[in-house]
């Protein structure tokens, strides 16, 4: 994605020399100040992308294969896996092309590299936006299934889910093209940050409300069976821990990237902000880590999906 200091990585590699051995240490910024820079080895970057790619391909394959998983909930999970797959795949492709250009194994004109960079930017940006949208869609779907359980199947139908999926993908592609075309405008970057915060607030509000309802339900069952208080207190602690992990992972993996965008608007020339800008590849790696974790949280916990996955893997052998 086009952002300060990193918006033309492919073009920069045409005339660059191979980078030094990746490290974690102090680097000097433009003002001479010392700052912490975490360099991500290309091998690690590609490895993370490959793990994410394999995981999410397995999720998409399992859902496509099992007709029992052709429901609105799994439709959103499948699209989340697809968007995470594209995030990882596009970053892997960009890294691989950069390495080939730097090694002289790939010869290309600047115009060709520019077009390739634009295509990768659109794929990366649109898939990132789609991933955030589908995380929100999954939260909304689960909320409706709990608070409108009796009407769930009439509210969330497969045709409506498909229309929502189509709308998310179309909007993600259109807005990503708009963002990339006007990436140097502060308003565009702020819109992205506001969108991230809106998704974070939406997920937090919905999941906290669901946790409160689950605790009320557990307390009702405890009173019905005349259980001791520690039983439902333990449930509440477990639910709170699960919620903290879910939202914590989301914030830790996505937050630094959007902090990066915010600082581009607020302090593009400040020495401290310049130090943070140097860690852009680390922020991308965290997003890929989120793409690795998403299947573990949303997909692999399903017994039906795990069973289908075993069948797929056994058949492949």
Curated annotation (Swiss-Prot):
A lipid is attached at residue 315 (S-palmitoyl cysteine). Its main location: membrane. The chain crosses the membrane at residues 38-63, 73-93, 119-140, 164-183, 192-211, 241-266, 280-300. Glycans are attached at residue 29. PROSITE patterns: G_PROTEIN_RECEP_F1_1, G_PROTEIN_RECEP_F1_2. Interacts with MGRN1, but does not undergo MGRN1-mediated ubiquitination; this interaction competes with GNAS-binding and thus inhibits agonist-induced cAMP production. Interacts with OPN3; the interaction results in a decrease in MC1R-mediated cAMP signaling and ultimately a decrease in melanin production in melanocytes. This is Melanocyte-stimulating hormone receptor. It comes from Cercopithecus mitis.
């Amino acid at each position: 994605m086009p952002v300060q200091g990193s918006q033309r990585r492919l073009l920069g590699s045409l005339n660059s020399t191979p980078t030094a051995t990746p490290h974690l240490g102090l680097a000097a910024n433009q003002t001479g100040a010392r700052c912490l820079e975490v360099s991500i080895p290309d091998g690690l970057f590609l490895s993370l992308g490959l793990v994410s790619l394999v995981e999410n391909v397995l999720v998409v394959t399992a859902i496509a294969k099992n007709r029992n998983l052709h429901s609105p909930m799994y439709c959103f999970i499948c699209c989340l896996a697809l968007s995470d797959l594209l995030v990882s795949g596009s970053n892997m492709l960009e890294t691989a092309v950069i390495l080939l250009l730097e090694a002289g194994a790939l010869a290309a004109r600047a115009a060709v590299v520019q077009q390739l960079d634009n295509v990768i930017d659109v794929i990366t940006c649109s898939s990132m936006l789609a991933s955030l949208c589908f995380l929100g869609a999954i939260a909304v779907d689960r909320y409706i299934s709990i608070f409108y359980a009796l009407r769930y199947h009439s509210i969330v139908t497969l045709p409506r889910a498909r229309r929502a999926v189509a709308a998310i993908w179309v909007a993600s592609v259109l807005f990503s093209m708009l963002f990339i075309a006007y990436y140097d405008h502060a308003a565009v970057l702020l819109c992205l940050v506001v969108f991230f915060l809106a998704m974070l607030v939406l997920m937090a509000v919905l999941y906290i409300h669901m946790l409160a309802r689950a605790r009320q339900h557990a307390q009702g069952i405890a009173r019905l069976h005349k259980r001791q208080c520690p039983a439902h207190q333990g449930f509440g602690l477990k639910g709170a821990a699960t919620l903290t992990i879910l939202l914590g992972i989301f914030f830790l993996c996505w937050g630094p990237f959007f902090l990066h965008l915010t600082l581009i608007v607020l302090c593009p020339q400040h020495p401290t902000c310049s130090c943070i800008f140097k860690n852009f590849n680390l922020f991308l790696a965290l997003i890929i880590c989120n793409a690795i974790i998403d299947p573990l949280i949303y997909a692999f916990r399903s017994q039906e999906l795990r069973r289908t996955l075993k069948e797929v893997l056994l058949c492949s052998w």
